[in-house]
């Protein structure tokens, strides 16, 4: 079973918080897969901030990095990939969860 969540409009901080909440909730409910719609970063306002990396200012790059760097989350993750075109392609990521 798949859980789908749209992160459009979230700041990086809020998106990371929500991603963690959703992953941990899905683990408890034995979800197998999560589709996060991140967008392609075309309309990202954070590029104006010189202190933020251009790539990591976009959710499609920062969300996977956040998950990999958070030990509470990464231990539950089987894989993180771009979605198939029919599921949003480059504007979405598929998280497959481990069976625990």
Residue map of PLM features:
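Long, charged, low-complexity intrinsically disordered regions
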Residues: 1-33, 40-100
């Amino acid at each position: 079973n798949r859980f789908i969540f749209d992160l459009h409009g979230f700041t990086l901080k809020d998106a990371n918080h929500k991603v963690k909440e959703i992953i941990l909730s899905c683990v408890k409910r034995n979800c197998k897969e999560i589709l996060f719609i991140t967008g392609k970063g075309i309309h990202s306002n954070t590029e104006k901030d010189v202190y933020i990396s251009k790539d990591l200012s976009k959710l499609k790059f920062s969300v996977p990095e956040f998950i990999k760097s958070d030990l509470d989350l990464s231990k539950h993750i089987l894989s993180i990939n771009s979605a198939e075109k029919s599921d949003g392609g480059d504007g979405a990521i598929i998280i497959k969860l481990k069976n625990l």
